[in-house]
């Protein structure tokens, strides 16, 4: 039973009415979803409630709730209409929220005493079987008021009884209404003596026709203010009520409409109307027919012209209006239709017209119209209000209700509203008057109506109206005011007074698209500020804005956003914040300080919004230290630099230190401004000293060592700053684009790691950061787009070390720059679009970075040559105008962009600023980098006896044919057999290539734009080969590939990384690197040490590489330790810096040539049009000049390798000297430790080729520094070589301009040093300075003199030509080393025997021509063993293809050295040089001096002391020969030959000569020619002399 009842209840489930209390959803819902509403206990309780009920009785109870259900109202009553409506209205009126209502109708059988016998759903019962009952169940929400529910439950029986009675009497009431209408229509008895009776009859029929819900009826006899009800007439609710209303009207009107004082329970908020019809059956007797009911919706919306009785009054009103043509008839008709229908019953035609005309007169005026009408019984006052439609809001309506209740003394109020398309809203208020109110106490006079109307008008005046009034004095147009009256959102209007909006409008009107304005104001609350943030064009989320504010050191207490559109449609967002500063931030002491703080705060947050300031705690300094945001940026930039420098403290810690020490922080800024503010330049030094002292005093007072270190680091950085663009105000500067640049002196920055460059520029902005490191005034190197945001300086420092070494061969020293993009574009998923967006941002950051560099770089006035300091830059260093850049990783195509930036600055270098641009030397077209590296390859192979240009050889490579270095390199010989190669996309395998056909195909790919290995013609690949993607899971390995790569026989497939490793370890002749990345390391290195994670999977160790030679066209392909390991394992390799130096060399030539040509353009000697043609016409010769440097260096490296073991001790001392005096770091440069050098000495090996290359570079760099610091480049004897740096055409056409070149000193120096080191060897200058005790510059002087005197350069070139002609490298190396011995000995001679400092030009004049004349006659003077030795040596050279004259010249090299003594002696004794030569060489032969000298050469030189001892003996022997020559010449005659002179001398000095010869004979016979015996021999020769032999002539 219970379950059946539950199903019946649930089948009628419906939600609450939409306007019921607590409604969240309405309407019927799925039954299954509400099983939990009806528990068995609940249904059982309902069943118990229904178990006993008398007919007509209503049972109601409240179920208190259980574990399954909440509280519920339970009702059992007879079935009748309108039961549920009555219950829901009752609950609504008592404010009781319910969750559902269920009202199943059951067919019930009961016993005589009302006990329940049977119950079943009525639909299932047979007709006539029992009575229908409605069981109503209303689940109540838990929040419902218990007392209200109890009261509602008490009222239920009575209310439902009325509903039931209405249903029972419904027909009778309608019949009574029709009956009365008939009586009125016929009036047979004359009871209705009124002209309107037929209209009233029609009205009653209209009411009965669905326009009036009848609730009750009664007849009353009225008279003398009393009413008596006829009991038999009572129907509906009036049947159940005994109270009797007094007469409802005192007028003679036939029909009166009154309103009940109690609301109905049949409709929410509805008060029933009473339709009263007066019948007069006798002279003094009046009967009121009272029909109580509710107008239906149809009635309330009915056309007034279709309602009987009312329609006539309306027509009469309109007719009256027609008499005046000015009255708008249709408008009047429309207005009348807006009057609530019940009110029409109370209005006459005249009143209707007056009301309508008043509304017409209201027009578009923004005011309110009120019509008052009091009930004659003083029960209520009807208030009809017309107001502008847009002014009708809930808030306005509620305020109107308050006014009307207050002003009319009401006890309550009801309303109904009508809002249509007309300009007005119509609200009908009914003010309920307190019971007992006297009719004459209700004031509805015109005066009171007007007064209340004014109050209502004020109530309807909205915020916008008040704002417009408040703006009377503001200069804002009426149209704008009208716009903003509607534009401001409601929440804004609730938050702000209208007058506050006037200031906002002014700010809003000043906004631009994507602009911002902030206003900070104090509030009445302590330490609480109001911040208003205005945004034009773009909104922002709270998650965007809060971090900005929090970074300023404030807490956001409250946030309110508002949105509106400006008059021009620009969307504007207003955010109002309540903020409070951190408790540790001091409050501004006075109003002026508060205003200043507010302005700085607003400016700072504005800058943050625009991206000019980063979001971090540095921003707190605006309030803590009283700084501007620009000053904060200075400190932030220094902090960023410290982090890049490897400072051990985090940025967070640095922020905390500065914030906790605001006074010191302020002092740091004072110091910075004192140093660099151009407006303080006159007394800036004094201010700076004071500021520095203040900073020092602040720091000295600190207790914390960490804090001390942080603040001292900032002070150190500021004092190490040489220049800044902070004060630059030019609109085209980097500073104007929010870029800050510091030029620093790294040598005095204590926190910097080694090595420290000479100059450094740090560029900072929120968008880009970068550094540019320079190791000298004239320096060059590439700019890299780095992806290492956290440590890009570390990356650049590593690169600049290699660049410094690479630049050893060119004019500028090493430099390197790099930048990071800090705000890359958000990825969209569209790869092409993302790439383009990323590139565009990179280009813009590159521009900003270069602009930052140029902001602090001097310029040169081309007309005068004067150096010009950038405006508004305080310079704390000397002139510094040389800044050039080059392409690097990520910036390969950016040269033109760099030159555009330089041009915008009017920079003196023009497009020489960045070489490789569209007007310049195209490195790829020239193939210059690859060709330079190929010189290294050719040299390595020549040493193995292989000619790469005529003999086939096998190669594996890194790169593809579209690349510059790889592509050009693999076309430099048609004998390349490329076995395998890979790039980032593909792997190429050709195990048995045909050299010729594969060269042709590689050429085709090289010429094919954007080609890859996938484009290679597969039909040309040998059997077993192919092209495979690196994305494949595995790659099959053919037998042919196994053989070519030296793989084990069981290898049948490899993953791409494993295959690439196999390629790198392949047993081939050459490994050619033309790619990007590091692929070979040392076994002792971890992959993490390499810093190239992308290639960790494929990297191999140097001792695993089986290629015989590695050619490094690309950079960093092998680690420094990896190169050494490969070399020690038997491989041949230099350094990448040496191999690929042709690129930078070519760029340097381009820069210097452009400087030269541009000077000619300025002078009018060359037109701008001719400039490009002139530049490009020299491409080939420039290439040859560059490659000559590569050949020279490779020849130097070859001979250095050949001599490495014997010179290890010298090299070790050189390294130590560079460490001690030049700041060289062995570990950084991968040079061996002293322990490793001892190990190699024991093993009989010297420095490896990479180590020699590094040592060579540092020797050149050191020598360049020394020469530049001297006056050598300014002397003609050195400067005369300057023109030969330039191509022939420039030498011919611009000879004068060459002499005045801006970098003439640097070019001369570079030429001098390259010539010296490449010709005389790496150790020449060091050994000379060590041996003789002179400076490096003296060594250069001696070399230049010797070079000119003996024609060393010409001889050297002839040796190289012999090598090119096929003479073995071992032979040409021997010849070169022999030539260097001449240079060594001759150089020392000049430094020992000639006045110092050496007058190079004079010495050349003194010796040059005579040496040239005497040298060809050497064969005339050499005798005995000397002649035999020379002949044998020359013959050996000639046997290897060396031209005989060259062979003989080299063989006599050490004898030519003696010509210096010969010529000097001849000058001293005034004898002919040929006579002296004959005597000198006769003495040498006679004494066997050459044998002794040869023995000396065989002495050990393992350490410095042995070397010095060797040198001393040799010098002693030569010195004795010189002295003896003087003695012999003194006793001989000019016409005697050498032997005759010697014989005569021996006769004269027989005793000394005899003793000496006896000792020498014993030494020769003994054969033990060690240091001791040779020392004795030298002493014996010296003992023969009678003079010193060391005299000099001027």
Swiss-Prot record:
Catalytic activity of the protein: L-glutamate + NAD(+) + H2O = 2-oxoglutarate + NH4(+) + NADH + H(+)
Activity vs pH: Optimum pH is 8.5.
Keyword annotations of the record: NAD, Oxidoreductase
A GO biological-process term: glutamate catabolic process
Transmembrane segments: none
SUPFAM superfamilies: Aminoacid dehydrogenase-like, N-terminal domain (SSF53223), NAD(P)-binding Rossmann-fold domains (SSF51735)
MF terms in GO: glutamate dehydrogenase (NAD+) activity; L-aspartate:2-oxoglutarate aminotransferase activity
This protein's record includes keyword Repeat: no
Primary enzyme class: oxidoreductase
Gene3D superfamilies: NAD(P)-binding Rossmann-like Domain (3.40.50.720)
Active site: 816
Entry EC number(s): 1.4.1.2
Cross-referenced InterPro entries: Aminoacid_DH-like_N_sf, GDH_C, NAD(P)-bd_dom_sf, NAD-GDH_cat, NAD_Glu_DH_ACT2, NAD_Glu_DH_ACT3, NAD_Glu_DH_bac, NAD_Glu_DH_HM1
Regulation: Activity is inhibited by unphosphorylated GarA. Stimulated by manganese and magnesium.
Protein family: Belongs to the Glu/Leu/Phe/Val dehydrogenases family.
Known function: Catalyzes the reversible conversion of L-glutamate to 2-oxoglutarate. Highly specific for NAD.
Subunit structure, interactors included: Interacts with (unphosphorylated) GarA.
Record protein name field: NAD-specific glutamate dehydrogenase
Record lineage: Bacteria, Bacillati, Actinomycetota, Actinomycetes, Mycobacteriales
